[in-house]
Structure formats: C-alpha cells, structure tokens
Amino acid sequence: MRLYRDRAVVLRQHKLGEADRIVTLLTRDHGLVRAVAKGVRRTRSKFGARLEPFAHIDVQLHPGRNLDIVTQVQAIDAFASDIVSDYGRYTSACAVLETAERLAGEERAPMPALHRLTVGALRAVADGSRPRELVLDAYLLRAMGIAGWAPALTECARCATPGPHRAFHVAAGGSVCVHCRPSGSVTPPQAVLDLMSALHDGDWPAAEASTPSHRSQASGLVAAHLQWHLERQLRTLPLVERVYRVDHAVADHRISLLRQDVHRGDEPGDQLAAGS
C-alpha cells in the first residue's frame, strides 16, 4: 500500500523499545491512527520534537499491518510550549486530547469535524485570550454534538416540548419538562443552561458575561453528561483547574512535573495522576 499524507493532532505517545515511540494521532481524513516513530528518542532525531502531544502536524505515514510508520513530519502549529507553561492551560488541553481520543471511535474512521474542533480548541487554550474553562466546556459540548450526544438545552429531551425547562437529568438527555422530569433531576439556575447554550452555539459575549458560580455549575453538568455517555470517568477532568485562586507554589511544582512528562514523551499528566 502506498504512503499517505494527512494533517493530525498528536494525542499521546509512549515508549517502544530503546529508541522508538508509538504515537496516537487524530488525523483529518483517516481518523484515529496509531503509528511507530522510529528513532525519535535519540538526540539527533530529525522530527522527535514535532511529535509531542498537542502538536498539529502534517505527517506522512507508511501503512503497516498493526501500526503505521511515520516517515515525515512537518509542524503546522506548535501549541505545546504555551500550553505546558501554565497548569490550568495544560490540564484543560489534556482533557481536550483525552476526549478527542475517546470520541474518535474506531481507528481509521474519518472524523474531520472532530479534528477541526480539536485544533481550534488547542489554539484557543494556547492563546489564552478566552477563559480556559469556557473553552474546554465549549469543546466538550460541541464534541458531544459531533458524536450525537449533545444535551437538550432548549427543549425537553424526552418529548421535545420547547423550553426553557429548569430541570436537567443526565440519563434523560439534558433539560426535561415538568411532565417528563425523572426523579433525581437537578434544577440549576436558568443562567446555567443559558451559559451551556451559549458555549455550544459560540455566543462568546454571553458566555464571558457569566458568573464564576454559573460557570462552575455548567462545568459540572457538562462533565456529568459526557461521562455518563462514555460510561467511565475521564482521567484528566479531575485535574482540570477551575479555581481562580491557586496556590502558586503547588502550581509551579505541578508545571515542573508536566514539563518532565512532555520532555520524556510520557502521556501528559502521568506523574500527576500517579500522585507525584
């Protein structure tokens, strides 16, 4: 089979043998691809640094039986340095990558919309011009929409009666009317559901006008909805920093650990998840 070329986001990588790595890529035209990058752990590797997590690359691959082989790499966007320099950006970007991999589904199933959304989210997190917690929640809502899991926010998830409806139930699919409301539903302020709608629709002026309390509640609903559909918790979401007052000494220590992960090519957040 011939070589093929595609644009990709590097989701993660891990060691293989003495000098190689296996990289997991979300490509534009070929979906999820796992490939071997030979010799990238050697100091003279010509493209090792271009295969760090968070990188947006143009990559050429040779198809293999189980794993493809990376033959050429050109950097398109190098988001890693801006992301890793800040703990909050890093954890948010890690959640983006993990979500992308989970939602990509089977290998080689094209997901161009998810690829495009993931690149945009990483660019926004790295740029830092918008609150990272809002960028993450907007990404999660839109990614769930691509997967067909978007929560109902403006109509009843069960009977489609137009809203607004105050009750929200994850298993029911989002907002529910008084007639369909299951036991265990929560009743967040209407502003919380309005914020979720704004994030899903890209209404940034409305989203950025929200209060910290409403952002926190919206984040909780978004995370719960995603994890219910995934049927397991994301490793990275508990690490996401959504608090504005941070102990800078702790944050600096965490950043140093995260930089070590990226430098060594470990999966982002391994040391934090291990409690180091």
Swiss-Prot record:
Gene name of this polypeptide: recO
HAMAP family membership: RecO
NAD listed as a keyword: no
Keywords from the UniProt entry: DNA damage, DNA recombination, DNA repair
Protein name as catalogued: DNA repair protein RecO
Function statement: Involved in DNA repair and RecF pathway recombination.
Transmembrane feature ranges: none
Record family assignment: Belongs to the RecO family.
PANTHER family: DNA REPAIR PROTEIN RECO (PTHR33991:SF1)
Entry GO terms, CC: bacterial nucleoid
Gene Ontology annotations of biological process type: DNA recombination; double-strand break repair
